[in-house]
């Protein structure tokens, strides 16, 4: 099964913690790293914007990706949230297996 690293950013620590907890509770992710705040600079609707954001690094599997994306869209306050999925091409086999087990649909447990 393919492991994915999904990246998103939240506007504050409180919303980042809520999203991380929801993804774990719903078994959509095995682990969510709530990272240190970062400064983002981007163009939005023709204007250069700057914002302090809280990055999330979400470990999941390809079969759960659509549900992860849906949950992020549901819980994220932005109109167009960053949602980027990066395939994991290598890793400690035991860790990748753990991700697969934790993200298994309840009927597969």
Language model feature labels by segment:
Residues 1-109:
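Positively charged, small/polar-rich N-terminal and surface patches that mediate targeting and assembly
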């Amino acid at each position: 099964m393919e492991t994915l690293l999904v990246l998103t950013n939240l506007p504050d620590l409180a919303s980042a913690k809520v999203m991380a907890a929801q993804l774990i509770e719903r078994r959509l992710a095995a682990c969510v790293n709530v990272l240190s705040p970062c400064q983002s600079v981007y163009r939005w609707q023709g204007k250069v914007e700057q914002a302090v954001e809280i990055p999330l690094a979400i470990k999941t599997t390809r079969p759960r990706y659509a549900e992860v994306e849906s949950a992020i869209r549901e819980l994220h306050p932005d109109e167009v949230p960053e949602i980027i999925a990066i395939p994991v091409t290598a890793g400690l086999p035991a860790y990748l297996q753990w991700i697969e087990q934790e993200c298994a649909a309840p009927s597969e447990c």
